[in-house]
Every structure is written in C-alpha cells, then in structure tokens.
C-alpha cells in the first residue's frame, strides 16, 4: 500500500512538473540512441534499459545511489526530494527507474506504449531524455 501511494505521489509530481532540468534539443538521433530495435519509437523496456545504463554511468563511486551532485542537470534538488520516498537524500536504482517509468508515461499522452519523435520533442519527452541519456 505504501509503495502504491508513493508511486501515485511520484507520478503526480512528475506529470505536474514534466521538466526536471533545462529542456534539451530533441531530434530523431535521440530516438536512435535509445531504440535498439530501430523501429523509430522508444518503448518502456527500452527507456528502462537506457535509464539503468544512465544510472550506472552517473554512479562513479558505485555506492548504488545518486545524490544531488551526481544528478546535477538531470534532476533538481527540489525534484530529488519529490522522487525520494525514503527521504535519504539519494535515489537508488529502483527509485531512479520509477522516475524513468513515470516520466515515460508523462511523455506518452496517447498511452500507446511507445514514444515517437513528436512525443520525445515535448517538454515531458525532453525530461525523459534527461533521465536516460
């Protein structure tokens, strides 16, 4: 129950404020970078795989968490607090991937399970790119 509530709060926070950081310029190249099956769209599985790889890249001390310094440019300190259900000041991989999933859903307003170039160019899509690049 607590996980569902925290997931609902997380999703609400993400949908209410779709951009964590300054939007990036998004092009078809961005899709190709996260689209290993080359179908021209990003599905949730691909977004989570890219998010997992991004998390690993962002965690140079390999402590399994990302703090505000490691998240700089991807998640503001204010948004870190919203995304941190255990309030320890860091995001572990599970918390980070929950943010990726929620942002994927925010960037997919037609709920077709994939993000195309138009959706990726939206503010919510740009915020997703910030998390998975």
UniProtKB/Swiss-Prot annotation:
GO cellular component, one term: periplasmic space
Domain EF-hand as annotated: residue spans: 35-46, 59-70, 84-95, 108-119
Keyword terms, alphabetized: Metal-binding, Periplasm, Repeat, Signal
Pfam assignment, any one: EF-hand_5
Subcellular location: Periplasm
Uses: Has been used for metal extraction from two distinct rare-earth elements (REEs)-containing industrial feedstocks covering a broad range of REE and non-REE concentrations, namely, precombustion coal (lignite) and electronic waste leachates. After only a single all-aqueous step, quantitative and selective recovery of the REEs from all non-REEs initially present (Li, Na, Mg, Ca, Sr, Al, Si, Mn, Fe, Co, Ni, Cu, Zn, and U) was achieved, demonstrating the universal selectivity of LanM for REEs against non-REEs and its potential application even for industrial low-grade sources.
Chain's role: High-affinity lanthanide (Ln)-binding protein. Shows 100 million-fold selectivity for La(3+) over Ca(2+). Binds 3 equiv of Ln(3+) with picomolar affinity and a fourth with approximately micromolar affinity. May be involved in receiving and then transporting lanthanides (such as La(3+), Nd(3+) and Sm(3+)) to a specific periplasmic destination.
Name under which the protein is recorded: Lanmodulin
Taxonomic lineage from the root: Bacteria, Pseudomonadati, Pseudomonadota, Alphaproteobacteria, Hyphomicrobiales
Gene name in the database record: lanM
